[in-house]
Amino acid sequence: MTRLENDTFIRALLRQPVDYTPVWMMRQAGRYLPEYNQTRARAGDFLALCKNPALATEVTLQPLDRFPLDAAILFSDILTIPDAMGLGLYFSTGEGPRFERPLREEREIHSLIVPDPGTHLRYVMDAVTEIRKALNNRVPLIGFSGSPFTLACYMVEGASSNDYRQIKTMLYTRPDLLHHILEVTAQAVIVYLNAQIEAGAQAVMIFDSWGGALSHAAYQEFSLRYMTQIMEGLKREHDSERIPNILFTKGGGLWLESIMASGCDAIGLDWTIDIGEARRRTQDKVALQGNLDPAVLFSSPEAIAAEVGKILASYGHGHGHVFNLGHGISQFTPPENAKTLVETVHMQSVHYHQVS
């Protein structure tokens, strides 16, 4: 058992009393920080940075050295699993991630195997271990994975997509093939996240970035079903410590009750739903994470403080809230505005945790 200097984030996820609302930011180690860009240049490219545990550790800690954040998140990419499956991940300048061998043929789909994280994804586990050591129990470390459906989107489309034409065609014409991809990928995510926990991750998060593109029925069948499988297979305790988990579907505000039923400890919210409404609907049975529009960070300190105040007031008194953005921080965000966000959350939230 290790004693964290700051366990506010873990306590909030477990809906335990805290003195203030903890805060971290999705993509907090990223291109908006000059020091990140310098480290990335040393690595050569983004993928080389992800696969170098020493440099991944360096960039993971950079935002914590600037801001009083309450958690660190592993610096990696959601597409490590399909890359380890042999699809050939690469990054094109200005185009984002792409796969050399997207899944289009039935034979390729049925040959998918669950990669061994101890061999094919060793660099991720080494990074988790190194980051934990470098953090020296300052704050907890979050591990993560993409959701099966979001990973499948990239695996079938071969890249980002505006219309999801390839995967939705498969969904409606050959659902059996898509279910096979999702089944294998769900098992891979379980093994991958449990390996991260064994290596030192103290909480884990599933990013369902593209689940919100599905219809109501399709979301239940092709996204949430497999995330529920993951919830059932995840380690909930390691070294006598609870390992909480967060499930985030971008555009998932329609399905909060169903997401809660998956068995997750916390639901991540994007900025399109009022957090107070989300709290009423989930009845304090799960923690909530979110949900500032990242574009607010392009505005003034006064506007940032006002928008933070609205979210804190909407959530209201009591525990179970982790403040975050509703999606990843933009590369164009002034770092001083991120600092304003973190400090404002800490300062304004104390009021909501005081016992009257």
Curated annotation (Swiss-Prot):
It is found in: Cytoplasm. InterPro entries: UROD/MetE-like_sf, Uroporphyrinogen_deCO2ase_HemE, Uroporphyrinogen_deCOase. Substrate binds at residues 27-31, 77, 154, 209, 327. The keyword Repeat does not apply. Signal peptide: none annotated. The record marks 77 as: Transition state stabilizer. It catalyses: uroporphyrinogen III + 4 H(+) = coproporphyrinogen III + 4 CO2. This is Uroporphyrinogen decarboxylase. The lineage of its organism: Bacteria, Pseudomonadati, Pseudomonadota, Betaproteobacteria, Nitrosomonadales.
